């Protein structure tokens, strides 16, 4: 039961940090490459 309480207290913190960093990364990508729906990596 103690392990379950530890898991339930750690999981929201880890998921908040993960989604916060992911949102920050997406914001910075959209700031550097605005309106890039398709990255033209494969266009020759």
Swiss-Prot record:
Localization of this protein: Plastid, Chloroplast thylakoid membrane
Gene3D superfamilies: Single helix bin
SUPFAM superfamilies: Subunit IX of photosystem I reaction centre, PsaJ
Alphabetized InterPro entries for the sequence: PSI_PsaJ, PSI_PsaJ_sf
Presence of keyword Thylakoid: yes
Transmembrane segments: 7-27
GO CC, any one term: chloroplast thylakoid membrane
Keywords in alphabetical order: Chloroplast, Membrane, Photosynthesis, Photosystem I, Plastid, Thylakoid, Transmembrane, Transmembrane helix
GO biological process: photosynthesis
Superkingdom of source: Eukaryota
Pfam families: PSI_PsaJ (PF01701)
Mode of membrane association: Single-pass membrane protein
Family: Belongs to the PsaJ family.
HAMAP family: PSI_PsaJ
Function text: May help in the organization of the PsaE and PsaF subunits.
PANTHER family per record: PHOTOSYSTEM I REACTION CENTER SUBUNIT IX, PTHR36082
The name this protein goes by in its record: Photosystem I reaction center subunit IX
Organism field: Morus indica
